[in-house]
């Protein structure tokens, strides 16, 4: 093939962004930066204009997730990567248990293992593309797993394992929050970042924390454990109660996040969002199951994610070449997770992505593959 094929316009999605984070940002979100930005950009994050944005985020999330009584919306800078360290310092009393089945679910386990103030964690692993069964152990005081493993497209429902009464349930919902069904009462810490379902930039973490989790934060603080201020959950809880962050936040991220939360709530809340991602994912998986050359990577339909779809290709088809041609035609970020090393495409299907665009994507892929033959 000497030149890049041009996909017919009637096969292309209206918006070609299918990344798994950062993800598609709606035009209305960008417009909101222009409309309200002049009143908050370049102003103190300790004063009312920016604090009102933070308050909008916190109250909007409380509505979106039907936050149980006593739960708090806590936020801080640094994204989920920083929160893993904050949790190791401020939520694990002595020892944790982690379910791992991919790159991101393994990271919290690694952080816990390397923290000098707590014991080595118990790690229950499953191969990429599959899901470990949530379990408990009487020796642990925190159990954690990923609601959605972004690298592989595996979703594990949120629940309290039998025998876990004395442990916090900490769910990494970085790519699942806002796009997968959840009853937040089934977790003590449901934490995430804005660049997936919430269609904003990264660099912020948000945690929905139960009274039990807040008590643990206070308990560990009172124990005198040393913690860097940037990773201090007591400081984050205190600042969040005042609609602030410990250090200066990226205001654009907060504005994009606030607008997306308002949009989701205005459309019908979490029920609407999850029905939309279910629609998108059913289109992708049904196409792959009917295809002669593609198949869902996650073999168990019960664990196929509604927000991140991974599709394996027959060895005769070079998925990397397909992604390259798609990108040249404005359909971007369908490449697989780099460390997984599979001949596949990975498709983000967050609420901002129109299900019709997912259908158009499958048509574009079929056309590209026909040209490669």
Curated annotation (Swiss-Prot):
Cofactors (names): pyridoxal 5'-phosphate
SUPFAM superfamilies: PLP-dependent transferases
Keyword annotations: Amino-acid biosynthesis, Aminotransferase, Cytoplasm, Pyridoxal phosphate, Pyridoxine biosynthesis, Serine biosynthesis, Transferase
Catalyzed reactions: O-phospho-L-serine + 2-oxoglutarate = 3-phosphooxypyruvate + L-glutamate; 4-(phosphooxy)-L-threonine + 2-oxoglutarate = (R)-3-hydroxy-2-oxo-4-phosphooxybutanoate + L-glutamate
N6-(pyridoxal phosphate)lysine found at: 196
Entry function: Catalyzes the reversible conversion of 3-phosphohydroxypyruvate to phosphoserine and of 3-hydroxy-2-oxo-4-phosphonooxybutanoate to phosphohydroxythreonine.
The protein's assembly and partners: Homodimer.
UniProt name for this protein: Phosphoserine aminotransferase
Main location: cytoplasm
List of residues binding pyridoxal 5'-phosphate: 104, 150, 172, 195, 247-248
Family per record: Belongs to the class-V pyridoxal-phosphate-dependent aminotransferase family. SerC subfamily.
GO-annotated molecular function: alanine-glyoxylate transaminase activity; L-serine-pyruvate transaminase activity; O-phospho-L-serine:2-oxoglutarate aminotransferase activity; pyridoxal phosphate binding
One GO CC term, this protein: cytoplasm
Cell inner membrane as UniProt keyword: no
Residues where L-glutamate binds: 46
Any single GO BP term: L-serine biosynthetic process
The keyword Cytoplasm is assigned to this record: yes
Compartment annotation: Cytoplasm
EC number(s) recorded for this UniProt protein: 2.6.1.52
Free-text remark on how the cofactor is bound: Binds 1 pyridoxal phosphate per subunit.
Signal sequence annotation: none
UniProt-listed NCBIfam families: serC_3
């Amino acid at each position: 093939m000497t030149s890049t094929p041009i996909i017919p316009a009637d096969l292309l999605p209206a918006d070609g962004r299918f990344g798994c984070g950062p993800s598609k940002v709606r035009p209305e979100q960008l417009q909101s930066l222009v409309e309200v930005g002049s009143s908050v950009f370049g102003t103190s994050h300790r004063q009312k204009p920016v604090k009102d944005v933070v308050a909008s985020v916190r109250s909007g999330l409380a509505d979106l997730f039907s936050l149980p009584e006593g739960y708090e919306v806590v936020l801080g800078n640094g994204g989920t990567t920083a929160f893993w360290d904050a949790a190791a310092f401020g939520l694990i009393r002595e020892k944790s248990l982690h379910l791992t089945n991919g790159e991101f679910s393994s990271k919290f386990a690694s952080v816990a293992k390397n923290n000098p103030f707590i014991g080595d964690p118990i790690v229950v692993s499953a191969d990429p593309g599959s899901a470990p069964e949530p379990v408990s152990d009487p020796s642990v005081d925190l159990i954690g797993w990923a609601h959605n493993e972004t690298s592989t497209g595996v979703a594990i429902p949120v629940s309290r394992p039998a025998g876990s009464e004395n442990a916090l349930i900490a769910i990494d919902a970085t790519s699942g929050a806002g796009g997968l069904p959840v009853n937040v009462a089934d977790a003590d810490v449901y934490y995430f970042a804005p660049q997936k379902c919430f269609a904003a930039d990264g660099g912020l973490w948000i945690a929905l924390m139960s009274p039990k989790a807040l008590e643990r934060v206070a308990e560990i603080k009172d124990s005198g454990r040393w913690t860097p201020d940037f990773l201090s959950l007591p400081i984050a809880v205190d600042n969040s109660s005042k609609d602030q962050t410990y250090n200066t936040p990226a205001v654009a991220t907060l504005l994009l996040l606030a607008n997306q939360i308002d949009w989701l709530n205005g459309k019908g809340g979490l029920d609407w969002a999850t029905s939309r991602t279910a629609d998108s994912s059913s289109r992708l998986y049904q196409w792959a199951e009917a295809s002669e050359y593609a198949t869902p990577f996650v073999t168990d339909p019960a664990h196929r994610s509604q927000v991140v779809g991974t599709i394996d290709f027959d060895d005769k088809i070079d998925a990397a070449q397909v992604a390259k041609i798609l990108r040249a035609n404005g359909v971007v970020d369908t490449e697989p997770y780099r460390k997984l090393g599979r001949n596949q495409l990975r498709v983000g299907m967050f609420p901002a992505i129109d299900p019709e665009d997912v259908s158009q994507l499958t048509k574009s892929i079929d056309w590209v593959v026909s040209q490669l033959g």
